[in-house]
Amino acid sequence: MKFGKDFRSHLEETLPAWRDKYLAYKSLKKLIKNLPPDGDPPPVAAAAEVPAGDGDGDGGIALGNWFARVLDMELQKLNDFYIEREEWYVIRLQVLKERIERVKAKKNGAFTSKSEFTEEMLEIRKAFVIIHGEMILLQTYSSLNFAGLVKILKKYDKRTGGLLSLPFTQRARHQPFFTTEPLTRLVRECEANLELLFPIEAEVLESASSSAKLQPQNDDAASHDPASSVDVETSDVYRSTLAAMKAIQGLRKASSTYNPLSLARFFHGEDGEACSGAITSESDSYSDSQIEDAEDDDKEVQSREQNTAQNAAEGQPRDE
């Protein structure tokens, strides 16, 4: 299944409040498809009033500057939402930890019955389960949007003959929405609290958060999963995360051709083994310099192929 279909399927399954916060992948594809052949930026009205290029230089450069502005607006949207959610999770986790301490402090004598204490702890567990699921979903939000951005940049370069992919991808890798180390620490902190308070629940959640091992499940399997039986709200988060993981799994497939910007490179190590994490800034095996080196290698290979073809056309012997 193509990435666009997977991306659309994920949007249909994700939390309703999140749907308009994702990369406008479909709209950007249409925009690229309708780019004029002369290399000039389309009218401002055709791109939701995005400022056009200066238009006082090479048409390709002006078009590249204009499209970069379009993508800048998308990056701003992604960053704003990601930062907002991450800050909310920091606050929410602190509130839950304080709530746990209060429950512990009044355990001996403050509760009228054991059932009241159990109910309070179950409410805390539910809150942890939901926030854990949403943080995992935010990690996949980062991965899918970055993957979509890479796809869009490739389509733009192919359509226009531009060279926007490499510099813009490098820039995107340093944006807040792609810097997931703080979020990963929050996930681990949440799992540590769950393991301490609810060992069985923690095992279930840690298994679900392992993107390298998570596989799509059918309806029968999901109906028997412990995480799907907590309640409707928790199930919505769980289902949304599964949909995101399914889309990411399609990106893990190794490419048949070498490409420094191939999404499979962000999902596999140098030895070809799948990485355990999503496409995030934590996948630091591919630094800016390595991508540049890979680009140089590609140019050298292309140059050799051109020389070989020219020699063959001239009837000269082919260098081995």
Swiss-Prot record:
Instruction: Give the location in the cell.
Output: Membrane; Nucleus; Cytoplasm
Provide ranges: composition bias, Polar residues. 278-289, 304-313
List UniProt keywords, sorted A-Z.
Answer: Cytoplasm, Membrane, Nucleus
Effect of inactivating the gene: Growth inhibition, Pi accumulation in shoots and up-regulation of phosphate starvation-induced (PSI) genes downstream of PHR2 under high phosphate conditions.
SPX domain: residues covered = 1-170
* Regions of compositional bias (Acidic residues) in chain numbering: 290-299
Region Disordered: start-end pairs:
209-233, 275-320
> Do you know what upregulates this one?
Up-regulated during cold stress. Not regulated by Pi-starvation.
One GO BP annotation of this record: cellular response to cold
* Tissue-specificity statement: Widely expressed. Detected in root cells, with the exception of epidermis, and in mesophyll and vascular bundles in leaves.
Q: Name one GO cellular component term.
A: cytoplasm
PTM (free text): Degraded under Pi starvation conditions through the ubiquitin/26S proteasome pathway.
Give disulfide pairs as residue numbers.
none
Q: What Pfam families does this protein's entry cite?
A: SPX
Q: What is the effect of changing K155A?
A: In PBC; loss of inositol polyphosphate binding
Role summary = Inositol polyphosphate sensor that associates with transcription factors to regulate Pi starvation responses. The SPX domain provides a basic binding surface for inositol polyphosphate signaling molecules. Interacts with PHR2 to inhibit its translocation to the nucleus and repress its DNA-binding activity, and then negatively regulate Pi signaling.
Q: How does it assemble?
A: Homodimer. Interacts (via N-terminus) with PHR2 (via C-terminus) in the presence of inositol polyphosphate. Interacts with BHLH6.
**Could you tell me what this protein is called?**
SPX domain-containing protein 4
